[in-house]
Amino acid sequence: MSTADIIARCEALYEDLDFTAARQWKEADPSRKVIAYMPVYVPREIIHAAGMLPLGIMGGGDGLEVIHGDAFYQSYICRIPRSTIELGLSKRMDFVDGMLFPSICDVIRNLSGMWKLMFPGKYVRYFDVPQNYRDDVGGNYYTAELNELREGLEHLSGRKITDDALRASIKVYNENRKLVQDVYGLRSREPWKVPSADVYLLMRAGLVLPVEEHNQMLKDYLAAAVKVEAQKRDNCRVIINGSFCEQPPLNLIKSIELSGCYIVDDDYMIVHRFLRNEVSTAGDPMQNLSLAFLHESISTAAKYDDKEEDKGKYLLEQVRTNAAEGVIFAAPSFCDPALLERPMLADRCSENKVPYISFKYAENSGQMQPIREQAGTFADSIKLWS
């Protein structure tokens, strides 16, 4: 199977706002249930161990007209909650049995309450995370939070989630994280062979497919990508930062690369890479998931940094690891976490002589020429003067 065949399948999944693949998975067995989740991170291992399908919801993108969703939020709020409400009210998510709202920002917290009011018969949970990273404080708190989620899913499914089932799920998601890192690593080494639009669509597919199917898709893509013959261009190597929640249109990603930039790392859909290393399968699986969050999770604006000096360390590590020549801060309009963190990260870049530019977008942005011109000018300036 060629990379083109695989990406064609991924693009069809990306454009399908009725989530047909997830619907078909559920219809194949009447006992199956689907648990949807918003960005940035949820422990999908627990959902999987319950025999359920985790379904990532990234809003409606540029393919959904928002009609009812605008009535729920003010004009100065980002678009993803509006389009998510539209997905719900238009019955595109009527097959979903539950919805998780991770701790991202006040808007998503409020959306969880709205969802409870709009869909009273559904399982809805706001999933909180610790802001203290001591094992005996934040660790105990987060383990209790995980166990509450476990109990809620047990009640919904009518069956116990055993420790052995959790360990098996951790193992399959460890494999998924490894394969995702392999794809990102290949793109970083040879970005001319692995277009960022391909990587993006591969990751989007992983939000709607069973993890086992996604693992095979990633293996197939890696096997095909190494055989690709593509011409290396004199492009600038950049990192995208700030796009961890509301997603950019696919054309925006393509426009950045067409402007003369190779995207060598990003924070799109970081649920796939939120935990940097394997989660242990020995001992208590809930405690292992808790400790992995405390000590192995990446830094993002949606996660609390308990030490000021840690702010920007992860971004600078990305720059070094990927031999990046610049950073593009691309955040959704009105995204409080990303836009509040941006000046701090920009200061770290300036202190370390890392060039950067910034712009804002919405998931339905249509005019790409200004962004392409800005990114192209940035790439040219790095080639000429960096």
Curated annotation (Swiss-Prot):
How activity varies with pH is as follows:
Optimum pH is 7.2-7.5.
The record describes the protein's role as: Catalyzes the anaerobic reduction of benzoyl-CoA and 3-hydroxybenzoyl-CoA to form cyclohexa-1,5-diene-1-carbonyl-CoA and 3-hydroxycyclohexa-1,5-diene-1-carbonyl-CoA, respectively. The enzyme also reduces other benzoyl-CoA analogs with small substituents at the aromatic ring.
Q: Does the keyword Hydrolase apply?
A: no
Q: What is the protein named?
A: Benzoyl-CoA reductase subunit C
Cited NCBIfam families: benz_CoA_red_C
Cofactor requirements of the protein: iron-sulfur cluster; an oxidized flavin
- What's the domain of life for this entry? Bacteria
Gene Ontology biological-process entries: catabolic process
Alphabetical keyword list: Aromatic hydrocarbons catabolism, ATP-binding, Flavoprotein, Iron, Iron-sulfur, Metal-binding, Nucleotide-binding, Oxidoreductase
Enzyme Commission no? 1.3.7.8, 1.3.99.n1
Subunit relationships: Heterotetramer composed of A, B, C, and D subunits.
Which reaction is recorded as catalysed by this protein? cyclohexa-1,5-diene-1-carbonyl-CoA + oxidized 2[4Fe-4S]-[ferredoxin] + 2 ADP + 2 phosphate = reduced 2[4Fe-4S]-[ferredoxin] + benzoyl-CoA + 2 ATP + 2 H2O; 3-hydroxybenzoyl-CoA + AH2 + 2 ATP + 2 H2O = 3-hydroxycyclohexa-1,5-diene-1-carbonyl-CoA + A + 2 ADP + 2 phosphate + 2 H(+)
User: Which family does the UniProt entry place this protein in?
Assistant: Belongs to the FldB/FldC dehydratase alpha/beta subunit family.
Provide any one GO MF term from the record: benzoyl-CoA reductase activity
